[in-house]
Amino acid sequence: MINLDFLTLRAFFKENIDFLIGSRLQKIQQPTRRDFVLAIRNCGESRKLYINIYPQMYHLCFMSKENEEKRNITIPQKPPMFCMLLRKYLEGARISDAIVVENERILELHFETYDELSQKRVLCLAIELMGKHSNIILYDKETSVIIGCAHNVGSEKSRYRELQGGLKYIAPPISERGLSNELKNQFKNLTQEKINEYLNKEIYNPAIKDDKYTLFAELLDGSTPQKSVNEMLDNYYASVQERVNVNAEKSKLLEIANSRLKKTKNAVSKISALLKKRDNTEKYKLYGDILTANLYVKADYQKNVELFDYVNNQNIIIELDETKTLNENAQRYYRLYTKSKTTKEKSEEMLSNLNIELEYLENVLYSINASKKLDELADIKSELGLVETKNKKQEKPAVEKIQIQGFDVYIGKNNKQNDYIVSKLAKDDDIWFHTRLCAGSHVLLKINGVEPSEEVLFECCKIARKYSSATQPSKVGVIYTRGKYLRKPPASPLGYVTYKNEKEVLV
């Protein structure tokens, strides 16, 4: 990440000085401990000055609406203490002057205010953008007494410069570091002849081109031109912040989804092991049948009885309850059979549901890893039940749509979108694609009365493979079938579907 330096700050300042001086501060907001939004108005134009003093991302800029959404700014219901202090002293005040401290990453905004006796008073808001030492300090310009700081600095953190209310504001110390010894040694022995040799040396030798700015054209190839320094700062740091926010949200959701996946896998293992154990269900029924067929035998109130097993053609010894008659023992075995059969059926049903849940969670994990925007992760967060769903009409998911040779193709990026594709978009003749045996997006090819060529079908298969968890270089099976052969079982998770009459292509 590129950090803000003095030259960039000064360029931003020169670009916006005319708007800043004479403007009025209308509103102050503090989303977190280390970022602030100042709503400033001048000559009928309103802008939001965004200040970020996080050590890894310190910067300031006038923020666009689009980039405000990228930054995922949420204003707390109860403002922090420093925000309330700034509101008390600065809201409604006019910026009378603004300066960038020479060779420092410090912007000072001077506010013209009035005290309780209606006496004019100039307050300075020092915005210090200096890495881990970044801070915002409000102090009296005349007395240099600090009124408040975004975060206080005590003597245990800095012996030179304490920052807290009531103390004098001291500017940051000037760095006394000069050139390193290595650089000094390199420059010390330079003669005029050597300097001329370096100046005349060819450092770039491209092929002949008409563009006289060839060097810069090639260096800037692939970059995006910006209209202003402010736009550059706003767009760059908003994209960085969005990426940081997305990665942080991904980490949280992955931890939750992996935890659920682990629990589900453990449950599947336990039930599978239980079902694989020796099953006595049929044995209980056989014992009941044998005892019923031999009720004439005098074996009441005995510990066991030896009878002929007509299924396996051999004599067997059947354990009995000596407190019961032979008939009562037969009924006891039938009850054991019924209970065992019911338990087995319930276990198999539970195992089936757990396997569906397992497939669903694997799709969730894929969706989290594939997500690149916060709104996509918000869908997953809602899907996992981590946020309250409001009682209002649900908005249609923003499913990605592309075109292949005139055909519309829809791609689901999460289970909510996948479910919408299957439940709402897919018609009987449309063609649905998905990777076999691995998580991935649902891909839907809309037919609209025109049958697609083999080339179009193969392109859709390639898309289904691309948007899946299949990372190995070897070929992967992609299945496709008509919409009329899809079925969503009742009470099944989002995005879960069964299918038939499918075809498979290796991609």
Where are the regions a protein language model picked out?
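Extended, highly charged segments
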Residues: M1-V507
